[in-house]
Structure formats: structure tokens, C-alpha cells
């Protein structure tokens, strides 16, 4: 069902006027009508309402900011249980080998026991290899570039290629902000591509356009003098 398809991640900028459940549901319905074959939704209540309004699989996550761990994505079994009850089809979790309140094995097993499919949000090939070995269903490149190093501007197509070559069900995710980059992910073996900011974060996209137009203006002004 997801082969060659686009998954839309709907996670508005925190504190944005669009960061309200009713707007998230509206964007989810619009994305489904436009052809999205799955949705990635953060927050239990958001998952609950989106699942009632749409008919495509939902990748559910809970994001937390913990004082004693850098892990943010679905760090607790209670998050898994709540997402499953709310209507998630797939539950994604941070699969990186970092300090965390509950082990990644514990989280993966909880997802399996919930009856949902599991998706590993990975930062490198070792993360994906670990996840595949314990039976995680979907291996994502979600966290490549987000685990301490300087954040790149381009997506990690090489990691997508490595996952695909290893036979993993590969979800390309992270910095796929143009249709051309999404197509390259499929060319490199991704089963599907998740796109977020370029579709659902108005503030981010507006900043991209402003930066581009202002750079030209500044360059022209410097030349004129």
C-alpha cells in the first residue's frame, strides 16, 4: 500500500497558531484528499481525532523533552499504550543507542504486543540493523543528522540506500523538502517518503522563501554600491 507513496507528517511548529488539534485534523483530511497514503501524527489526542476523521494508516508518536535523556520520540511504554488505544496503526520510536528511561527493546516489544506495526526512527545503519534483527517492521532514516552532529541541509540518501540494500522496509524521512528529493529517495530504494515541514509548517516554508528573496536583494544592493 505504501510502495512509492508519500507520507505526510503533520507536526506544526510548537506554539504556532496552527498547533491546535482542529487544524491538525483539517490538514490531515486535506493531505488524504490530495493522495497521502499515511500520516505521521504527534500526540495522543491528535492521533485520536485524526484517526476518526481519516481512512489512511497513522504513524503515531509522542514527543517528550526529558531532563535526563536526549531521546524524544516515544520514550515510554505508557506512550505506546496510549497511542495504540488512540488509533495509531504504526507506532514510531527512537531506535538510537543512547541513554534513555526505558530500553529500546522494551519499547519495541511493547509496540509488538499492542498489535500495531513498529517503526524505528534511526540515525545510522547500526540503528537500523539492530531494529531489523529484532523484527521491527519499518526502518526509517528519521534521525540521521539529528543526534548531536551539525545538522545537514540535505537528506541522507546514502543511509536510505544502505537500508534498502540490506533488505529493510525503508522509510525515507528527514529534510525531504522538494518533490525532486522525494523522488531520489525512491530511486535509492525507499519504499515510501515522509514529508513534513515542506507541507505542513507554514512558518518554516515562509522563512525559506524570505531567506532566498532577501539574499538576492542584499546581493543586488552590494553590487550597486
UniProtKB/Swiss-Prot annotation:
Q: Name one GO biological process term.
A: N-acetylmannosamine catabolic process
Report which superkingdom the organism of origin falls in: Bacteria
Q: What is its EC number?
A: 5.1.3.9
Q: InterPro entries from the entry?
A: Aldolase_TIM, NanE, RibuloseP-bd_barrel
Which is a Pfam family this sequence falls into?
A: NanE
What GO cellular component term, any one, is given? cytosol
Write out the GO MF terms: N-acylglucosamine-6-phosphate 2-epimerase activity
Alphabetically list the UniProt keywords. Answer: Carbohydrate metabolism, Isomerase
Catalytic activity of the protein:
an N-acyl-D-glucosamine 6-phosphate = an N-acyl-D-mannosamine 6-phosphate
- List the pathway annotation: Amino-sugar metabolism; N-acetylneuraminate degradation; D-fructose 6-phosphate from N-acetylneuraminate: step 3/5
Query: Which residue ranges traverse the bilayer?
Result: none
Reported function:
Converts N-acetylmannosamine-6-phosphate (ManNAc-6-P) to N-acetylglucosamine-6-phosphate (GlcNAc-6-P).
Give the protein family. Belongs to the NanE family.
Q: What is this protein called?
A: Putative N-acetylmannosamine-6-phosphate 2-epimerase
Q: Whose protein is this, by species?
A: Vibrio vulnificus (strain YJ016)
